[in-house]
């Protein structure tokens, strides 16, 4: 490693070269997160419910977390989305149109004790799921 008066170019070249050893730099520079993301970098996406499923919570918790398999309209990809709220799954039927968003876990990953689920349902048939669960609104027919 040069330390002289004229070593700046070599130092800069080395920094540029060794940045590619940093996984976060590579993912950010090549835009890999957006390429792998089913939502394609968007904050929300529309989809059609394919089926309702129950997912077992991770240790030390013991529960069946209610979720749905959703096929996204924009690209046809299938994702699993969590249904937040007490009895929320009862307001969602197959073939309903839902809007999903990221669930908000660390580093864009899953959250809490729900393994492998990175998305949550926000709206059902253009009605807020939270309002449906609280009983303020009724689900509209599509």
From Swiss-Prot:
InterPro entries: NA-bd_OB-fold (IPR012340), Ribosomal_uS12 (IPR006032), Ribosomal_uS12_arc (IPR022863), Ribosomal_uS12_euk/arc (IPR005680). One of its GO terms (cellular component) is small ribosomal subunit. Gene3D superfamilies: Nucleic acid-binding proteins. Keywords: Ribonucleoprotein, Ribosomal protein, RNA-binding, rRNA-binding. Pfam families: Ribosom_S12_S23. GO terms for molecular function: rRNA binding; structural constituent of ribosome. It comes from the Archaea. The keyword Zinc does not apply. One of its GO terms (biological process) is translation. NCBIfam families: PRK04211.1 (NF003254), uS12_E_A (TIGR00982). Part of the 30S ribosomal subunit. PANTHER family: 30S RIBOSOMAL PROTEIN S12 FAMILY MEMBER. Belongs to the universal ribosomal protein uS12 family. With S4 and S5 plays an important role in translational accuracy. Located at the interface of the 30S and 50S subunits. This is Small ribosomal subunit protein uS12. It comes from Archaeoglobus fulgidus (strain ATCC 49558 / DSM 4304 / JCM 9628 / NBRC 100126 / VC-16). The lineage of its organism: Archaea, Methanobacteriati, Methanobacteriota, Archaeoglobi, Archaeoglobales. The gene is rps12.
């Amino acid at each position: 490693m040069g330390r002289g008066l004229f070593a700046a170019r070599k130092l800069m070249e080395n920094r540029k070269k060794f940045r590619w050893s940093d996984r976060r730099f590579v993912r950010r520079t090549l835009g890999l997160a957006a390429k792998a993301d089913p939502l394609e970098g968007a904050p929300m996406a529309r989809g059609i419910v394919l089926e309702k499923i129950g997912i077992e919570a991770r240790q030390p918790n013991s529960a069946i977390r209610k979720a749905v398999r959703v096929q996204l309209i924009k690209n046809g990809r299938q994702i699993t989305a969590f249904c937040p709220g007490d009895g929320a799954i009862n307001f969602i039927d197959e073939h309903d149109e839902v809007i999903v968003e990221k669930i908000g876990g660390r580093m864009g990953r899953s959250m809490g004790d729900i393994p492998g689920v990175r998305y949550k349902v926000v709206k059902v048939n253009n009605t807020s799921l939270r309002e449906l669960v609280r009983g303020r609104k009724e689900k509209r027919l599509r």
